[in-house]
Structure formats: structure tokens, C-alpha cells
A protein has these predicted regions:
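Glycine-rich phosphate/pyrophosphate-binding beta-alpha loops
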Residues: 2-7, 49-50, 210-215
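Glycine-rich phosphate/cofactor-binding loops in nucleotide/flavin-utilizing enzymes
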Residues: 75, 79-87, 91-95, 182-235
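Glycine-rich beta->alpha junctions and the first turn(s) of the following alpha-helix
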Residues: 35, 41-138, 211, 227
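A short core secondary-structure module
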Residues: 1-44
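C-terminal helix-coil-helix/basic helical segment that borders enzyme active sites and/or dimer interfaces
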Residues: 110-126, 137-193
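Tryptophan-centric aromatic hotspots in well-structured domains and transmembrane helices
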Residues: 3, 12-14, 31, 55-59, ...
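A structural signal for short secondary-structure junctions
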Residues: 51-52, 101, 172, 199, ...
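Short, well-ordered loop/turn and helix-capping segments at boundaries between secondary-structure elements
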Residues: 19-21, 35, 39, 65-66, ...
């Protein structure tokens, strides 16, 4: 299993395994919890472009998991995993982090010059910041709706996909705008005394590449919104 988030910190890992080889497609799969200390299980780190260790490759070599670790019904693990993804994709943190970065970029634009004038006077940058403010607010409202649904015991599905698309693309739009605003200095890493905003934008720009891929790509999320949200036929 590759690209496993935080496997180096976890004490258990979720496993979807086929328990009925004759069942079609999504059926015949069971959901198990496997202790990370189980013999035969190995975790190898994957370091991203920013130098962070968040992902891992987990290898299973003749690993045995007891029946008591079955979650839900046998052969219906796919549906447990799908519900789990709905919660993982909810992304209620995107708007909060996005608002902080937007405030930092706005403050930087108000107090720094580019080509002899304040960045905040540049119509292109003003337009970008205004669009980001709209995206942050949309992400916040979607997050609040998802949080309300979860509080009511409901499972957000298309709503989580909407939240993930808006939230993850917001992160990329923020870092792209930040890199353009900061210019060449925006490429400086955290720790450099010349790095604007302590190098956070450069770090964010490198880590955000995976945001629209992990937990289901933006293309997958849009398909979910189209089919389950709008009732459109599968392509």
C-alpha cells in the first residue's frame, strides 16, 4: 500500500482485502483493522518535494489479521471504506487555513512594493486576492454544512466531494498567487533570512501538489458530484 498518510505514527492501519474471490467488483471485500506491530508489516517513508515525511509505503508480507478485527459485515467492506472516505474528504480545515494565508498575503500586499508601487495597487493582484476571498468564504460555508450534517448523524457524500474540490483547489490557488506576489524571493525555503513570510508560501506550494490527488482526485470528485449530486448518467 503506497501513499499511506501518517503510517509511521499510527498504531493500526485500515485494510480492504478480498474475502470472496468469486464476488463481482465491489462485493466480496472486507474491512479490517491491522495492528502496525503485526509480523510481516513494514513501513517505509516517502519524503515529498518540501522535505516532509507525511506519506509512506506499507508492505504486507504474509501478514495475518484475526477475525475479531473485522469492521462491519464480512464482504461489505467496500461500503465501510466509501463512508470513511466521505468523512476524510470533508476537509473542514481547508477554509480556516486558507483564511490565515489570505490574511497574510493581503497584509503583505498592503505593505510591500513591486515595480515601484504597492502590490495592493496592482489591479491583477487585487483581482486575485478578491477571488481568493470568495473561494475562502465558499469553502467555509460548505465546511459548516458538512459539520452540521455530521453533527446530525448524516453521512455527507456529494457534499464532501464539493468540500474537497473547493478546499484543495483553494490551497493551490493561494500558493500560486503567493508565489507570483513574492516573486523570486518566494522560492526561498523556510529558514532563509530573506524568505518572505518565513518561507511558508514556498513550502505550501510544494506540498499542495498532492492535495488534489490524495483521497480521490478532483476529477473523481466531480464525477461523484455529477452522478450522485445531479443524477447525471455515468460516462
Amino acid at each position: 500500500k503506497i501513499w499511506t498518510s501518517s503510517a509511521h505514527r499510527a498504531d493500526h492501519i485500515m485494510v480492504l482485502t478480498r474475502t470472496d474471490p468469486d464476488a463481482p467488483k465491489h462485493r466480496g471485500i472486507s474491512f479490517l483493522l491491522c495492528d502496525m506491530n503485526t509480523p510481516g508489516l513494514t513501513v517505509n517513508p516517502i519524503i515529498n518535494m518540501a522535505g516532509d515525511h507525511g506519506f509512506n509505503m506499507v508492505t504486507f508480507d504474509n501478514v495475518r489479521v484475526p477475525k475479531k478485527n473485522l469492521v462491519g459485515e464480512q464482504n461489505r467492506g467496500w461500503y465501510v471504506g466509501a463512508t470513511l472516505l466521505d468523512f476524510e474528504r470533508s476537509g473542514v480545515d481547508y477554509s480556516a487555513g486558507g483564511r490565515r494565508v489570505l490574511e497574510e498575503l493581503t497584509d503583505y500586499a498592503k505593505n510591500n512594493n513591486q515595480n515601484g508601487s504597492l502590490i495592493s495597487d496592482n489591479p491583477i493582484m487585487r483581482n486575485r486576492l478578491a477571488n481568493l476571498a470568495i473561494e475562502v468564504e465558499v469553502s467555509r460555508l460548505i465546511s459548516y454544512n458538512i459539520a452540521w450534517m455530521q453533527g446530525e448523524g448524516l453521512v455527507p457524500n456529494k457534499e464532501s466531494s464539493m468540500g474537497k474540490v473547493v478546499g484543495t483547489e483553494l490551497q493551490q490557488h493561494l500558493s500560486e498567487t503567493g508565489m507570483q506576489m513574492l516573486g523570486l524571493h518566494g522560492q526561498l525555503e523556510p529558514g532563509s533570512k530573506y524568505a518572505p513570510l518565513e518561507g511558508r508560501i514556498e513550502h505550501m506550494h510544494l506540498t499542495n501538489v498532492s492535495e488534489t490527488i490524495q483521497a480521490g482526485t478532483s476529477e473523481i470528485q466531480r464525477n461523484i458530484i455529477a452522478t450522485r449530486g445531479l443524477g447525471l448518467p455515468r460516462g
